[in-house]
Structures are given as structure tokens and as C-alpha cells.
Amino acid sequence: MIEDSEIKAQISPFAMREGEIKTFDGKDGYVSMNQIIHKINMGHITDIHFTILEIVNEFEFITSRQIYQILEMKGIDPKSQDKLNNKLESLVKSKILTRYYFTSDDGKGVYRIYCLEKMGKYLLNSKEIECKWQQSDNTKPVGMIKKRLAGNQIIIAYKKKVKAFDSYVVKPALTAKQTGKVFKATGGGVKLTKSGKSIDFIFEVVRREIDWEKKFID
């Protein structure tokens, strides 16, 4: 896989583009749980597929490249991006995951975004893994999804480049002292530890969408 340092881009792939929309790239039709159980019994869906499912559940929206990098963070060798993409394709065909891409006035996006599908939630529940996903989550607008993708990249960058990296939280929550209102930072949070001392960083991602200044203040 090409390293991040080798990619020369003037504009972030997660920046907003004029006229950008989200386009469905998943599977239509019906898949039964019996079909999925058969695939598991036949060895077509294995432990690494379940790990991928857990990663998507944790991050909500994520690219295949980010999944690759997080698998490496967990000490799992995906072998190659093509092999990982084949596994993702299998999960999409089984309606365990679904997939989208962005299109804009500049053309079709170069990456796919993966998120949970109904069968994925069933499988997570069967393993007693917490899954707060609702089908309506997949209707979130482009701006919200790109914030999540940018937040994913912050977490990955800290893990790969900062020796003091300790842990991360995808959706850290802050509670206002006076109002008691809970805010969830869109960029995630990381904990750095060195010489027995720890410090937490929480990130808020801003995308230049319509009314972005007002949304940021709110």
C-alpha cells in the first residue's frame, strides 16, 4: 500500500466540493440470515471479516484505506489493499456492510465509504457487541460523513507518527458544566502518555459546507 507520505494532494480528499452528493454503491435485494450463516460455516466469512465489521461499527463511516491502516494498528496484516477490497465486496454483497461514493461537479470520487447494513447489526448483536447503528444513520449528509472521515485520519496519523500515542476515542463526549448539555467532538480524541504523564486531545472537524460558520458556533 502507498504510504501517506507518498501521496501528494493539494486539497484534502475529505474537503467539501461544490454540488457534492452521496451516491449509493451497495447491494439491492434481500439476503437472509441463513445465507450468511451458510457463508460462515463454509469459511467464506472468517475472523478478519468480523474484525472489519467491528471497525466499521466503531468508526461509523470509513474508507477502505482507513480500514487497512486500522487493521495494521491492531497487528493484523491485510496482505494487500486488493485482498481487503475483496473481503469488503463480500461483506457488501451479503448486506453486512453497505457502500457509498461522492460525486460532484468535478466528477466521481476516488474512494468508497463503508458503513453498517442491517445484517451487520444482527451479527454484532449475536456476539454481544454493542451496536447503536440505526438504518437512518446512513442518510447522514455529505458534510457529516466527511467530518467523520477526517477525524478517522487524525486518529490514524497520531497512532502512526506519535511515539507517545496511548489510546483513542472515536466520539469523545464533553458535558457543559452549566447547562449539562453533552457535546460529541467530531474529530475524535487521542491520549498521549510519556514518562508516566498523560494528556488528552479532543478534535473538532470543520468542513466548509453551507452555513459552516454558524454550525461551528452552534
What are these regions (language model features)?
Residues 1-128, 138:
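Nuclease-adjacent, charged terminal/linker segments that flank catalytic cores
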Residues 143, 155-199, 204-212:
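Active-site metal-binding core of divalent-cation-utilizing nuclease and nuclease-like domains
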Residues 124-169:
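Amphipathic alpha-helical dimerization/coiled-coil segments
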